[in-house]
């Protein structure tokens, strides 16, 4: 099956492109002229991705056009004029606390799906990933970064906090103390440090980034879908289970997989 682009007005308005190729999907941030900044329309487009993926999709690559992965929130939203056709933050924050929390919840939905579903998500990050861009990269299961990649949680420097699930995802990757230091200082983390901290799974030259990420996707697809899905579920929830509960979950997951493997061996003999 050849790769094709999904036609969607919602995605186009948000500056997002979705490409499908059999068991693979590629989500592309496609507003390089705005440094792939996140507007309300971009969040809406990203939140819609799960409903646009056919059931045969097993891996999802998240990448960006241009020299920068994502500059974070589109700062035009902070001005009275805002982004054309969208509510400004001035208007949004004029509402009551519940309405503002609901708005934030909608943004969080855009970043929740990469880890929550059975598919494996891979983020390919080049250049800067700032604020929401950093948190989008963190939402993926695996990160491949270019040698020029750099990350920063800029929110605290602006007097706000990372609120797109990044505090938890970062803590799970690098631990409490390091996550707090990265967030509280808003400093930059380069590709080499990201690799050392476990933020990045692989580093590649910028011109080889997409190919390296696609190779990783292919390596996932080379293994049986049921086993990959089961192991993601086990690893994803391991930190929330005690050893006995995790052992029980492994036993339950293994039974149907073991039977299927043995049947396959028997069928080949």
Mark where each language-model region is:
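Conserved CoA-thioester-binding segment of acyl-CoA-metabolizing enzymes
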Residues: 1-65
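Hydrophobic alpha-helical membrane-association signature
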Residues: 42-45, 103-106, 250
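A general structural signal for well-ordered alpha-helical segments in protein cores
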Residues: 75, 107, 167, 176-179, ...
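Terminal peptide-recognition signature
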Residues: 27, 31, 45-46, 62, ...
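C-terminal alpha-helix plus adjacent terminal tail
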Residues: 1-22, 53, 186-191, 207, ...
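Short, active-site-adjacent cap segments at secondary-structure transitions
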Residues: 67-71, 130-131, 235
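Crotonase-fold acyl-CoA enzyme core
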Residues: 10, 112-226
């Amino acid at each position: 099956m050849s790769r094709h682009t999904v036609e969607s007005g919602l995605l186009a308005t948000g500056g997002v492109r979705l490409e499908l190729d059999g068991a693979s999907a590629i989500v592309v941030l496609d507003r390089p002229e705005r440094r792939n900044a996140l507007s309300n329309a971009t969040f809406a487009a990203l939140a819609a991705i799960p409903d646009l993926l056919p059931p045969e999709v097993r891996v999802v690559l998240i990448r960006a056009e241009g020299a920068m992965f994502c500059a974070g929130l589109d700062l035009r939203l902070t001005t009275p004029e805002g982004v054309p056709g969208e509510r400004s933050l001035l208007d949004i924050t004029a509402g009551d606390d519940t309405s503002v929390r609901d708005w934030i919840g909608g943004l969080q939905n855009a970043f929740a799906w990469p880890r929550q579903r059975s598919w494996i998500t891979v983020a390919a990050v080049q250049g800067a990933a700032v604020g929401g861009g950093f948190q989008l990269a963190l939402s993926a299961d695996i990160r491949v970064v270019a040698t020029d990649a750099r990350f920063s949680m800029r929110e605290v420097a602006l007097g706000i906090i990372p609120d797109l699930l990044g505090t938890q995802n970062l803590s799970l990757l690098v631990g409490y103390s390091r996550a707090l230091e990265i967030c509280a200082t808003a400093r930059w983390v380069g590709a080499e440090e990201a690799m050392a901290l476990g933020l990045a799974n692989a580093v590649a030259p910028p011109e080889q980034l997409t190919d390296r990420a696609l190779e990783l996707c292919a390596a996932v697809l080379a293994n049986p879908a049921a086993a990959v899905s089961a192991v993601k579920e086990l690893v994803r929830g391991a930190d929330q289970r005690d050893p006995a509960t995790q052992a029980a979950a492994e036993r339950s997951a293994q039974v149907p997989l073991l039977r299927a493997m043995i049947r396959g061996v028997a069928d080949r003999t």
